[in-house]
């Protein structure tokens, strides 16, 4: 199974069984996935905004949490563990109703006990809106029979790639050593 298909199946599980995701970010779409990286987008609607009419920080925090889980799914974990740490840094306004917020999340480290992810968000003007990090306890998630971790190994080892070489916003892909 491809990373994209597997990530979308895990996302569908979130949407049908969780309490938060279907209420707040149900319209989020997974646009691309490969082992260790997921791209997604969310059309901004009223429930995503604050009283100023712009994207609410809680929406972005929810997306940091959920996208971190999806980054782990891109490595083959169906049950994606539980959060131990989550951080969001807000840099620019995310947009208003009708705008599109785009995100890219990367699995920085995929261990047997803990996994680490980082995400960045871009607004409709291609400005960076926020960046986040998410740490998850995954020791029990490795036991799920639905995992396909052997099928979804990244082409580049995490320790060989830097943030700059693994991101693809704007469609540019960089290879280590270029």
Task: Describe the predicted segments one by one.
Residues 1-178:
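Terminal targeting signals and extreme-terminal segments of soluble enzymes
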């Amino acid at each position: 199974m491809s990373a994209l298909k597997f990530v979308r199946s895990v996302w569908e599980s979130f949407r049908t069984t969780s309490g938060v995701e279907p209420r707040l970010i149900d319209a989020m779409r997974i646009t691309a996935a490969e082992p260790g990286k997921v791209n997604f987008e969310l059309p901004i609607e009223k429930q995503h905004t604050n009283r100023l009419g712009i994207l609410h920080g809680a929406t972005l925090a929810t997306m940091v949490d959920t996208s971190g889980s999806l980054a782990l799914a891109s490595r083959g974990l169906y049950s994606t563990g539980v959060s131990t740490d989550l951080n969001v840094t807000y840099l620019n306004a995310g947009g208003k109703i009708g705008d599109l917020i785009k995100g890219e999340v990367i699995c920085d480290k995929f261990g047997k006990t803990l996994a680490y992810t980082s995400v960045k968000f871009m607004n409709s003007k291609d400005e960076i809106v926020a960046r986040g990090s998410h740490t998850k306890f995954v020791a029990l998630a490795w036991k799920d029979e639905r995992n396909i971790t052997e099928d979804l190994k990244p082409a580049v080892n995490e320790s060989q790639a830097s943030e700059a070489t693994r991101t693809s916003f704007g469609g540019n892909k960089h290879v280590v050593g270029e």
